[in-house]
């Protein structure tokens, strides 16, 4: 089955965040060129419809992503074994292959050179960052085993962990945390993985990050903490998770130390 859009459509472009609190970008609007986009914003706005954790069959960043991209479906999303003719796949870059989860072609590219696994694109995104952003867990697992560096930051300090958290890909978040990445890494927007997980209303991802020690006091450049965002956006389940975590921390501090 042939791709319905040119390969270039898979290349994402940076979107400038809203500069004023009262006028954030609306993730539901269409771009000027007519393609659907999602735009990062750590400013509270009208809550989006409550979504469950991302389905394993869907691999595109959720609202709150730091990326602007077309919503081209990959072969895995369509449920097809092949999404393009071999000649078309051969024309894709290593970053596009990682984003689409085209493992066979990705492996062929990596065999061509030792330095390709951490090769950045024009925005500093590595294949691992792309795969993490699109929820391609098998690709993420393969790249980590191949030697991909999960600590690399893109030009605007975007990280694989932050983008995986943005999409609510809890399993990928877990894989990255096993590699001792900075759980509180911040990007150009002052956003941390926890802030992006809250912004996307990803309950399980928030739970996983808190369980691993994510900092609840960190503020984005907008001035909002994770709890502030949850309250402002009306994300009650996320708010409850944060409150329960705070209660556990408080209770643990009240437990007297064991006598020697």
From Swiss-Prot:
Expression sites by tissue: Ubiquitous.
Segments of skewed composition (Acidic residues): 22-33
Pfam families linked to this entry: Ank_2
Region of interest (Disordered), residue spans: 1-79
Principal location listed in the UniProt entry: cytoplasm
ANK repeats: 89-118, 123-152, 156-185, 189-218, 222-251
Location of the protein in the cell: Cytoplasm; Nucleus
Gene Ontology MF term list: DNA binding; histone deacetylase binding
Impact when changing residue 224 to A: Loss of interaction with RFX5
UniProt keyword annotations, A-Z: Activator, ANK repeat, Cytoplasm, Disease variant, DNA-binding, Nucleus, Repeat, SCID, Transcription, Transcription regulation
Gene Ontology terms: biological process: positive regulation of MHC class II biosynthetic process; positive regulation of transcription by RNA polymerase II; Ras protein signal transduction
GO cellular component terms, A-Z: cytosol; intercellular bridge; nucleoplasm; nucleus; RNA polymerase II transcription regulator complex
Function, in words: Activates transcription from class II MHC promoters. Activation requires the activity of the MHC class II transactivator/CIITA. May regulate other genes in the cell. RFX binds the X1 box of MHC-II promoters. May also potentiate the activation of RAF1.
Domain topic, free-text comment: Interacts with RAF1 via its C-terminal ankyrin repeat domain. The same domain also mediates its homodimerization. The third ankyrin repeat is required for association with the two other RFX subunits; RFX5 and RFXAP. The three central ANK repeats mediate binding to the PxLPxI/L motif of RFX5.
Known disease link: MHC class II deficiency 2: An autosomal recessive disorder characterized by immunodeficiency and recurrent bacterial, viral, fungal and parasitic infections in early infancy. Additional manifestations include failure to thrive, chronic diarrhea, and autoimmune features and allergies that may be present in some patients. Death often occurs in infancy or early childhood.
Protein name as catalogued: DNA-binding protein RFXANK
Organism of this sequence: Homo sapiens (Human)
Source organism phylogeny: Eukaryota, Metazoa, Chordata, Craniata, Vertebrata
Name of encoding gene: RFXANK
């Amino acid at each position: 089955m042939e791709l319905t859009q040119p390969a270039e459509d898979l290349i994402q472009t940076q979107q400038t965040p809203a500069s004023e609190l009262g006028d954030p970008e609306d993730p539901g609007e269409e771009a000027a060129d007519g393609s659907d986009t999602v735009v990062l914003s750590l400013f509270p706005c009208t809550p989006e419809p409550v979504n469950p954790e991302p389905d394993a069959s869907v691999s595109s960043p959720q609202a709150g992503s730091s990326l602007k991209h077309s919503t081209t479906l990959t072969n895995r999303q369509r449920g097809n074994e092949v999404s393009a003719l071999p000649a078309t796949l051969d024309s894709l870059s290593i970053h596009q292959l990682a984003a689409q989860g085209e493992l066979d072609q990705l492996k062929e590219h990596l065999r061509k050179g030792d330095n390709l696994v951490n090769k950045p694109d024009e925005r500093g995104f590595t294949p691992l960052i792309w795969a993490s952003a699109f929820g391609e867990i098998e690709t993420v697992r393969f790249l980590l085993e191949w030697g991909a560096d999960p600590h690399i930051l893109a030009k605007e300090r975007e990280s694989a962990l932050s983008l995986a958290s943005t999409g609510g890909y809890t399993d990928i978040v877990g894989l990255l945390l096993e590699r001792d990445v900075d759980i509180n890494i911040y990007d150009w927007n002052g956003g941390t993985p926890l802030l992006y997980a809250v912004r996307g209303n990803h309950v399980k991802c928030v739970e996983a990050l808190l369980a691993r020690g994510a900092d609840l006091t960190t503020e984005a450049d907008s001035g909002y903490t994770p709890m502030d965002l949850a309250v402002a956006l009306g994300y009650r389940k996320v708010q409850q998770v944060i409150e329960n975590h705070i209660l556990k921390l408080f209770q643990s501090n009240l437990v007297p130390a064991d006598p020697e």
